[in-house]
Amino acid sequence: MPDIGLEEVEVTEILVKIGEEIKLDQGLITVEGDKASMEIPSPISGIVKDITIKIGEKVKTSSIIMIFKVNNLNSIKNEKDLNYIKTEKKLNENFLEEKKDIKKIVLVHATPVVRRLARHLNVDLKNITPSGPKNRILKEDIELYIRNNTSNKSSFNIEKNNTTNFHKDLFNEIPITNIQQIIGKNLHQNWVNIPHVTQFDEVNITLLEEFRHKYNTEKKQKNNMCSKITILPFIIKSVAYGLLEFPIFNSSLSVNKKTIFLKKYVNVGIAVDVQNALFVPVLKNVDKKNIANLSSELIFLSKKAHENKLDASDMKDGCFTISNLGGIGGSWFSPIINSPEVAILGVSKALIKPLWNGKEFIPSLMLPLSLSYDHRVINGADAARFLTFIGKMLSDIRFLIM
């Protein structure tokens, strides 16, 4: 029984049978402690020769719960100062005749949650340096290992994609472009390295939409060639005010993760979907521009993106990113942070919903917003305040034009 931080636990479920062949990290038993149930994984691969515990029985750390026959000791790494699995000679006579020099088997100290995270990320726990009590591996140890080895592909046990060999007449192969590969790599790296949390909210934009439609109508009457202003410039401006009000959202984490850099400029990137690729042109000094200027610049950059004419200067020095899917549909989603930024705002399709005003239900246009943030830098309370502030800006046009 490995050390899971409790002296004694009760066995509530036995997940394997005698004679069954098990794999590394496969669940053996489920135990229940003072606060939660947890699954105890196998530290080795082998065949179950005996089960020494029963359901309802209480077991202590280091007590024998099962005995295995292991066919390949050469693949088992030796380490000192770790608990090891004991083998009874009388139950393994045939095996001991072939391998008399029994070596200690490594028992990695990690909770089932940490083990599942490692399996999901294809990380071998034996390569992790533990920092927890009693040499226990923590989730932070895995995150540190990944950050230190992201550029070194050989550090991971990347499993080959065992795609079924379909008959070639039954499917078409679509090559992944270089830009898609680069974008995919960056998205994966950001998702793995940044602890994402997403805050959701709805904003009443009824008055804003009335103002916007009236403004566009008047502009069209004066100049039929004038482009309509969409809701996005208003959102960009509200985000600019939010970044000034909450500077922690306009920051980046240092490489050594010990310092936060607060930026003295306000640049907002806009995710643009272009022919199966994703570009993020950046609007510079958003806090110093009015909504009409932002609308013109947004149209200009979007056109450059669709014509594949964006250069590096158009996509650098971003502080915060907005991903707008409102023109497509859907409600909420969890956008991936664009590192080294610490937050991103997702915008979905606005819908008419009944809103109670204290006396009656009023049809109101509600805009879903999804704020993903780096939990190492931003706490949940600040995220709620930031999103509430954005909602305040959008629900009353006077705040945006002052």
UniProtKB/Swiss-Prot annotation:
Every Lipoyl-binding domain range: 1-69
Cofactor(s) for this UniProt protein: (R)-lipoate
SUPFAM superfamilies (alphabetical): CoA-dependent acyltransferases (SSF52777), Peripheral subunit-binding domain of 2-oxo acid dehydrogenase complex (SSF47005), Single hybrid motif (SSF51230)
GO BP annotations, alphabetical order: pyruvate decarboxylation to acetyl-CoA
InterPro entries (UniProt xref): 2-oxoA_DH_lipoyl-BS, 2-oxoacid_DH_actylTfrase, 2-oxoacid_DH_E2_comp, Biotin_lipoyl, CAT-like_dom_sf, E3-bd_dom_sf, PSBD, Single_hybrid_motif
Record flagged with keyword Transferase: yes
Positions of post-translational N6-lipoyllysine modification: K35
Pfam families per the UniProt record, alphabetical: 2-oxoacid_dh (PF00198), Biotin_lipoyl (PF00364), E3_binding (PF02817)
Keyword Lyase: no
Keywords, sorted A to Z: Acyltransferase, Lipoyl, Transferase
Chemical reaction(s) catalysed: N(6)-[(R)-dihydrolipoyl]-L-lysyl-[protein] + acetyl-CoA = N(6)-[(R)-S(8)-acetyldihydrolipoyl]-L-lysyl-[protein] + CoA
GO MF, one example: lipoic acid binding
Superkingdom per UniProt: Bacteria
Active site per the UniProt annotation: H375
Domain Peripheral subunit-binding (PSBD), residue spans: 109-146
GO cellular component, one term: cytoplasm
CDD domains per record: lipoyl_domain (cd06849)
Cofactor binding description: Binds 1 lipoyl cofactor covalently.
Top EC category: transferase
EC number(s) stated in the UniProt entry for this protein: 2.3.1.12
Assembly and interaction partners: Forms a 24-polypeptide structural core with octahedral symmetry.
Stated role: The pyruvate dehydrogenase complex catalyzes the overall conversion of pyruvate to acetyl-CoA and CO(2). It contains multiple copies of three enzymatic components: pyruvate dehydrogenase (E1), dihydrolipoamide acetyltransferase (E2) and lipoamide dehydrogenase (E3).
Entry similarity comment: Belongs to the 2-oxoacid dehydrogenase family.
Protein name as annotated: Dihydrolipoyllysine-residue acetyltransferase component of pyruvate dehydrogenase complex
Organism this protein belongs to: Buchnera aphidicola subsp. Schizaphis graminum (strain Sg)
